[in-house]
């Protein structure tokens, strides 16, 4: 129905104003009916009886002149004689609705309280209802016999100036209120429109242009969070571009190498060289296969909603299996692996945890000097499980340490890895609600420490 928020807020606000005015009128009408009507009836009846008392004591020569004088004093009067003849004084009534039964009762000396007994009408205020049954009536004795006199104040005449004042006041109130509603709505909508334009810029890929935070209310908070979102999206976009560049590089380099080896293979007839080229191609394709596997694993970790973490894992046994699997690589470098493992159970994803711990051991074997040692420990600590793996090797600079867990980061250009192992390990540990830290001692002993929650109970 509303195509703009501006129109919606403006229409809603104006509707609230008009609806409030209507409800106020109805409530005022109810208040008059239940609280003021009886007292108003009594006051007018008192005035009419005082008029009768004056008429009886002063005995004016022409009673009609007396009623005419009352009419000039802003009263509306209707008299009915015993023949049913009606005479009106003052401003005319809007409608003659008085029943004959009420007239007869007054002629028989019964007071009439039409104002007090006026039925309630939701949208008609009895105070202003200018009809003959909304009057009070008593019997007057004249020289020509009894007459029934019905009277009510002439509200229209009495409050004519006030009604004009009130009408002008209400019109100005509505005009000013609606004008302020439109102006305030525009003030609210303006920053929303700027947000809309900023959103369109985001869609077009502009992550650099911020929006100015102009307020301190909810819209100001929205502006602040929009800027934070813009910064985050910009970082994600940079990471995406960096990721694509790295993947392209990691794939292009071995493919170029394979292409070169195939060319050499075609041109040589030396069996030894041909076998060497074939072996090199096999090694490179194996590395490409490993890269593909790790990229798929990264994608799985980034979209982890479908992953389950309900495997009951015997962590110490898992570590023993990993050590046994990598023992051959350790033996080739004459490395000693020392393991101090407590018996610990853990609830998680066994496949992923196996991958994370394997990456750390493979990394330790790779960077430990020949004849060195690798220390592995697993223990409880309060409500946590602590896993540490330490090895001696070359020192790591603070610059390298700060980027160890970045995707595709390599310590050296001559490193034949793809730089994803530690990034994958960190993601897996965080998905298990754990942390991983790297420390280095003065003796060039590097240590990776994994802390996991003890969730087996």
Curated annotation (Swiss-Prot):
Stored CDD domains: HAMP, HisKA
Domain Histidine kinase: from-to ranges: 246-456
PROSITE patterns in the cross-refs: HAMP (PS50885), HIS_KIN (PS50109)
Enzyme class: transferase
GO CC aspect terms: plasma membrane
Record-listed Phosphohistidine modification sites: 249
Keywords from the UniProt entry: ATP-binding, Cell membrane, Kinase, Membrane, Nucleotide-binding, Phosphoprotein, Transferase, Transmembrane, Transmembrane helix, Two-component regulatory system, Virulence
Cellular localization per UniProt: Cell membrane
Residues covered by the HAMP domain: 186-238
Record field: transmembrane: 9-29, 164-184
Stored InterPro entries: Bact_Sensor_His_Kinase (IPR050398), HAMP_dom (IPR003660), HATPase_C_sf (IPR036890), His_kinase_dom (IPR005467), HisK_dim/P_dom (IPR003661), HisK_dim/P_sf (IPR036097), Sig_transdc_His_kin-like_C (IPR004358)
EC number: 2.7.13.3
Pfam families linked: HAMP, HATPase_c, HisKA
SUPFAM superfamilies, A to Z: ATPase domain of HSP90 chaperone/DNA topoisomerase II/histidine kinase, HAMP domain-like, Homodimeric domain of signal transducing histidine kinase
Description of post-translational modifications: Autophosphorylated.
Molecular-function GO term, any one: ATP binding
Source domain of life: Bacteria
Membrane-protein topology: Multi-pass membrane protein
Function, in words: Member of the two-component regulatory system HssS/HssR involved in intracellular heme homeostasis and tempering of staphylococcal virulence. HssS functions as a heme sensor histidine kinase which is autophosphorylated at a histidine residue and transfers its phosphate group to an aspartate residue of HssR. HssR/HssS activates the expression of hrtAB, an efflux pump, in response to extracellular heme, hemin, hemoglobin or blood.
Name this protein carries in UniProt: Heme sensor protein HssS
